[in-house]
Curated annotation (Swiss-Prot):
UniProt entry keywords in alphabetical sequence: Calcium, Cell membrane, Cytoplasm, Differentiation, Guanine-nucleotide releasing factor, Lipid-binding, Membrane, Metal-binding, Zinc, Zinc-finger
Positions with biased composition (Pro residues): 605-619
Gene of this entry: Rasgrp4
Biased composition, class Basic residues, residue ranges: 1-10, 20-32
Protein name as annotated: RAS guanyl-releasing protein 4
PANTHER family reported in the protein's UniProt record: GUANINE NUCLEOTIDE EXCHANGE FACTOR, RAS GUANYL-RELEASING PROTEIN 4
Any GO CC annotation of this UniProt entry: cytoplasmic side of plasma membrane
Single GO biological process annotation from the record: positive regulation of natural killer cell mediated immunity
Domain EF-hand: 466-501
Family matches, as SMART domains: C1 (SM00109), RasGEF (SM00147)
């Protein structure tokens, strides 16, 4: 039997085994290059050297770190083990324990007169404090042990060892810093920088969202990642919590900006703009903000708007479906992972997916084996994942940002909305249809809000700072001559940029020229932000001026006031149409009681023969800036009057509001409600 017959026979035997009842042979990869992750994994295992086994003790690991340094302080044995230990040791033992072991080793070496080993330990401590200066402030005991170490060096070490403890040798390395800002235009320039949402180009909006995302991503530390993996929550990790809150805020901002438009065609224009923003984010490889924007567009409160989606072009619908498929959680985000593996240059990951990988790696194996030795491959795998994220933080973004536009976006994202409020707006725009409608083709990614509920309400100091920055930017661009005021037209367009514009938050009626000073604009923004961010939309009352025929007390004053009770022919006050709350004219801004809508009026349009509520006519300029000034309360389209949330009263006729259909006379309160108000 020659060689060919032998090969043929062996091939037939293998084929017979594979084709029979035995297990099929696994497919092999031939003539293909390994992935970068496979290469880094193999190189890391080679760098482990004598510790390439599955386990080692803490003392063995520490001894290997000491031997990395020579007499001149150079790393002659590589730095992989050293960096891995200094980064990952806090996952298995406190940093104070590691410092105490180093102090004990130094004292033992000094007793044995081993000056080289003493010098190596000093180099290790200096390297640790230089590359990880933040660890000293994280454990109270660590700083005391480090001080004891350098005190011991000053007493028992030579001149070379004592010089390493000098504060001038413990400088922390400078990081890449935040991405650069684009200088704002000077006052002498005639051209304004538009701070209007409709005037912002898709490229411009995507760049500024990427700037905010990268700045938030850069602030995340390894300690934040460790805290999340060990605790399973972002609580107690400020930078990580801020990054998650930013993503959730962007998602909800997209939803409310869509719902802020009154007509389906106008909402479709906002949808189309955000779809183009998402496409640009995909080109910039900013996948985290892409997840937030796409999640907002695919949210059920938005995807149910059938009348609005009808106005989208086929190209926009196709683009949204492609982005949704890219970020789908199917098969553990397989599509996104393939796309991410092929990306180069600047890129920002979906943070939730990569944190999920860290948790999976941590939970897969124990920290220590049954004999008490450390499970080294687990620490090394976690370290490699952390290094990938750290390398992304050292990137240089390809775009810059305008400070004024950042102030506009920052204040817009500060506003807080609950799921109930967003759904309330959605059903007000397009009420439920009794007929069965086909399901939406859009599938929202599961990880859109991967840390549910992490949308922190900004405190008053933060809101005040952001409002002050925005007002400064507004007057710099819209009052270049320095008159100290902006026109009513500019104010209308600016106020429509914010999501709270859809809740009827208008300023007091203007007289004369109608211009707004710096103080008035600041007061308006602070008041509107406080209502939306702290009190919530449920505190907005639909006040209407009425004449009380029976003695009635002001709910805000809590009794009679100097002008007497609210009754009589000339005693006029204000009553909320939804909950029946009464108050004086000058007290309607001080009402801090939640509007509890009566059950008989909630979602009930009334009998068929009843007169309908005031209904605003659609604006003539669909999608224009003037259309943005058309605002409504959450229940306008479902049967409630348009009202001001600034004064919490019905809107008065002014030049900057839509024309109103004449409203029928208000129905007098029933006898039961009158008795309850007495």
């Amino acid at each position: 039997m020659n060689r060919k017959d032998i090969k043929r026979k062996s091939h037939q035997e293998c084929s017979g085994k594979a084709g029979g009842h035995g297990r099929p042979r696994q497919a092999r990869r031939h003539k293909t290059c390994p992935t970068p992750r496979e290469i880094s994994k193999v190189m890391a295992s080679l760098n482990l050297g004598v510790l390439s086994e599955s386990s080692c003790s803490v003392d063995e690991l520490l001894e290997e770190c000491i031997r990395c340094f020579d007499s001149a302080g150079s790393l002659h044995r590589g730095d992989h083990i050293l960096k891995m230990v200094l980064t990952m040791h806090s996952w298995v033992l406190p940093s104070s324990d590691l410092a105490a072991r180093l102090l004990t080793s130094y004292q033992k070496a000094a007793k044995d007169a081993r000056e080289l080993r003493q010098l190596q330990i000093c180099y290790l401590v200096r390297y640790w404090l230089t590359h990880h200066p933040e660890v000293v402030h994280q454990e109270p005991q660590l700083e005391a042990i480090i001080n004891r170490f350098w005190t011991t060096v000053a007493q028992e070490g030579n001149m070379a060892q004592r010089s390493l403890g000098d504060a001038s040798n413990l400088l922390s390395p400078g990081g890449p810093g935040p991405p650069p800002l684009m200088s704002s235009p000077g006052l002498g320039k005639k051209r304004k920088v538009s701070l209007l949402f409709d005037h912002l180009e898709t490229e411009e909006l995507a760049q500024h969202l990427t700037y905010l995302e990268f700045r938030s991503f850069q602030a995340i530390t390894p300690q934040d990642l460790r805290g999340y993996v060990l605790q399973g929550s972002v609580r107690g990790c400020p930078a990580l919590e801020g990054s998650v809150g930013l993503s959730n805020s962007v998602s909800r901002w997209v939803q409310v900006m869509v719902l802020s438009r009154p007509g389906p065609a106008q909402r479709a224009q906002v949808l189309d703009k955000f779809i183009r923003v998402a496409q640009r984010l995909r080109q910039m490889q900013n996948f985290n903000t892409l997840m937030a924007v796409t999640g907002g567009l695919c949210h059920s409160a938005i995807s149910r708007l059938k009348d609005s989606h009808v106005h989208l072009s086929p190209d926009s619908t196709k683009a949204l479906l492609e982005l949704t498929e890219l970020l789908s959680s199917h098969n553990n985000y397989a599509y996104y992972r393939r796309t991410w593996a092929s990306c180069t240059d600047f890129r920002l990951p979906v943070l939730g997916v990569h944190l999920k990988d860290l948790v999976s790696l941590y939970e897969a194996h124990p920290d220590r084996l049954p004999d008490g030795r450390l499970h080294l491959p687990k620490l090394n795998s976690l370290y490699l994942r952390l290094q990938e994220l750290a390398a992304l933080q050292r990137q240089h973004p390809p775009c810059s940002a305008n400070e004024d536009l950042l102030h506009l976006l920052t204040l817009s994202l500060d506003l807080f909305y609950t799921e109930d409020e967003i759904y309330e707006l959605s059903y007000a725009r397009e009420p439920r249809c009794p007929k069965s409608l086909p399901l939406s083709p859009f599938k929202a990614p599961v990880v859109v809000e991967w840390a549910h509920g992490v949308t922190p309400k900004p405190d008053s100091a933060t809101l005040g700072q952001h409002v002050e920055q925005l007002v400064e930017s507004v007057f710099k661009n819209y009052d270049p001559e320095g008159h100290g005021s902006i026109s009513l037209e500019d104010f209308e367009k600016l106020s429509a940029n914010f999501p709270f514009a859809c809740h009827g938050l208008h300023p007091p009626p203007r007289h004369g020229s109608g211009s707004f000073s710096r103080e008035e604009l600041t007061k308006y923004l602070l008041h509107a932000s406080a209502i939306c961010s702290k009190l919530g939309l449920a505190f907005l009352h639909a006040f209407q001026e009425v004449t009380f025929r029976k003695p009635t007390f002001c709910h805000s004053c809590n009794g009679f006031v100097s002008t007497g009770p609210l009754w009589g022919v000339t005693k006029r006050g204000y009553r909320c149409q939804d909950c029946g709350l009464c108050c004086h004219r000058h007290c309607r801004d001080q009402v801090r009681v939640e509007c509890k809508k009566r059950p008989e009026t909630k979602g009930d349009p009334g009998p068929p023969g009843a007169p309908g509520p005031a209904t605003p006519l659609p604006p003539t300029g669909c999608g224009s800036e003037e259309g943005l000034s058309y605002t409504l309360s959450p229940h306008l389209e479902s049967g409630c009057h348009l009202h001001h949330a600034w004064t919490q009263t019905e809107s008065s006729h002014s030049s900057w509001e839509p024309e109103m259909v004449p409203c029928p006379a208000p129905v007098l309160p029933s006898k039961a409600s009158s008795k309850s108000s007495v």
